[in-house]
Amino acid sequence: MPRTARVFVENACYHIVARGVQNDDVFRNPSDFRNYLRLIHKYKIKTGCRIYCYCLMDNHVHFILESPFGLKAMSTFMHGVGMSHALRFNGKYNRTGHLWQNRYKSFVALKDDYLINLFSYIEHNPVRAKIVSKPEDYPWNSYKARMLGKKDIILDYITLAGTGVG
């Protein structure tokens, strides 16, 4: 059975989710997270994708992403980051096989009120998982940059419906 084609909406943001195969960890230590963030930066520049929010958990990742250059740029971004991380991770931990479960999921987010809730949902993921008590205490999300002004070379900024959020 063929895969369902991705929907591309020009000037829309997407909630992207990629999970480890069988919910296995895709990050085991801080250097794995840092490497993944470097890959995001590299492929963001290469493809022109914009990252408005992110959270890297041990076994999955979330992004709010915009792809001004179409579906191919978004796919190139996710493939480049995912494949590069998998090759490094598998080599580092002497493992073989797929690191990521299936292909990444993408959900179109058209309305600003939905995006505002999505920012909170993504950045509070480590709070819901009881890893930290506040999102700003988690080192692998965009909360500190977006809400507290900490420098983050990965993040782009978007203003939502005059809220100043984003």
PLM region spans:
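Short Pro-Cys-Gly-centered "Cys-loop" motif that presents a nucleophilic cysteine in a tight turn
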Residues: 1-57, 66-166
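N-terminal functional module of multi-domain proteins
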Residues: 62-64
